Each structure stands twice: as C-alpha cells, then as structure tokens.
C-alpha cells in the first residue's frame, strides 16, 4: 500500500496521540490538527482520509460536524467521533449502560470494508459512558455487543464509518487491522 496522508482531528480525548502514533507506525503520513481548524485548511493538507478522535464531550467537537457534512473523503469516527457522525446524520446518542473503559466482546453483524477480517467476534477496549442509541437513517449497522447495540456503523453511500471502541489501544484485538482496512478504503476512493 502506498503512503497516504491521514489527518487526525483532536477532540481532546486521552488517546488522540495513540491514534496518531498507530497511524504513523503503520507507515502513513499523519498529522494531528485541532478540531477548530477550518475546512479550507484541512483541504490544503490534501488528506486521503480523516480520523475523528474520541473526546470528553459533544460540546467540545469544534468544527467536526462541518467536516463530516462537507469534506468528501473517507472519514473514520472513533468513540466520540462515532457519536458525532451519528448525530450529524440524525441519529441519537445517550448514556450507556456501562460507563468507563472495559474489555467488550463485539459481534460483527456485517463484515464490510472496515471490519474485514475482524469477525465474527472480536475483543475490544471501549468506553460506553455515551453511545449511539438510534442509528441514522442512511447508515448500515455493522457491529453490536451485549452492552451497546450500535458498536459500529457506516454510511450507505459515502465512505463514512464509526466505531464505539478504541482500535488504537493495545487492549483491542485486531485494532491495526481496522486501521489498515480504513487505509484501503482511502486508497481506493
């Protein structure tokens, strides 16, 4: 695979730098940018893909909704990024049944581009303080768990994906595979 330019949007989550390091260690050109960066400045970077990091609250997502609505390249939302994507397209989020971080067994419902090779079950590290509770109309449900019905999703037409879990942490099995699957989507787009 050729080297791609992946922009990591900093939503002030504790694992943002781990996302950046993982992407870099997988031989991609990567840069962390503030979530207040203009769409124009992001496009000036000529990225092949965008990753929306996790973060503490929806009130601190800056311009992320504008990125999702107006930038036509592959986007992967992680945790809060996943929730933001859902809200942007009319889905709902709410408090999860299991707050805090824990190892979760995820069932892959549909092994699409982003979850290729991860199913039928995979162990992940996730926080469920908040989660997607209602899937947006234009999205396909990809994965679930006993503590969260919507662990992963993707847009029906656009290359927009969301996962509730953290593929960048060592506690997640096959996290690098998920990133490589996303890079393949970026390369093919």
UniProtKB/Swiss-Prot annotation:
Pfam families: GATase. Catalyzes the synthesis of GMP from XMP. SUPFAM superfamilies: Class I glutamine amidotransferase-like (SSF52317). It comes from the Archaea. GO terms for cellular component: cytosol. Gene3D superfamilies: 3.40.50.880. This is GMP synthase [glutamine-hydrolyzing] subunit A. It catalyses: XMP + L-glutamine + ATP + H2O = GMP + L-glutamate + AMP + diphosphate + 2 H(+). Pathway: Purine metabolism; GMP biosynthesis; GMP from XMP (L-Gln route): step 1/1. The keyword Transferase does not apply. Residues 5-189 form the Glutamine amidotransferase type-1 domain. It is an enzyme of class 6 (ligase). Signal peptide: none annotated. Keywords: ATP-binding, Glutamine amidotransferase, GMP biosynthesis, Ligase, Nucleotide-binding, Purine biosynthesis. One of its GO terms (molecular function) is ATP binding. The active site is at 79 (nucleophile), 166, 168. InterPro entries: Class_I_gatase-like, GATASE, GMP_synth_GATase, GMP_synthase_A. Heterodimer composed of a glutamine amidotransferase subunit (A) and a GMP-binding subunit (B). Its EC number is 6.3.5.2.
């Amino acid at each position: 695979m050729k080297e791609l330019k992946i922009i990591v949007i900093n939503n002030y989550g504790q694992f943002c730098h781990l996302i950046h390091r993982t992407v870099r260690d997988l031989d991609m050109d990567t840069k962390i940018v503030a979530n207040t960066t203009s769409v124009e400045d992001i496009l000036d970077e000529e990225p092949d893909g965008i990753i929306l990091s996790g973060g503490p609250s929806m009130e601190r997502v800056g311009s992320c909704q504008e990125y999702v609505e107006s930038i036509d390249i592959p986007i992967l939302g992680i945790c809060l990024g996943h929730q933001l994507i859902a809200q942007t397209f009319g889905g709902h989020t709410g408090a999860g049944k299991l707050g805090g971080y824990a190892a979760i067994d995820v069932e892959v419902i549909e092994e699409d581009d982003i979850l290729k090779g991860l199913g039928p079950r995979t162990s992940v590290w996730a926080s469920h303080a908040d989660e997607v509770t209602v899937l947006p109309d234009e999205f396909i449900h990809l994965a679930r768990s006993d503590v969260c019905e919507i662990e992963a999703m993707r847009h029906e037409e656009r290359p927009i994906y969301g996962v509730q879990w953290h593929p960048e942490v060592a506690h997640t099995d096959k996290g690098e595979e998920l990133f490589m699957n996303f890079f393949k989507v970026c390369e093919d787009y």
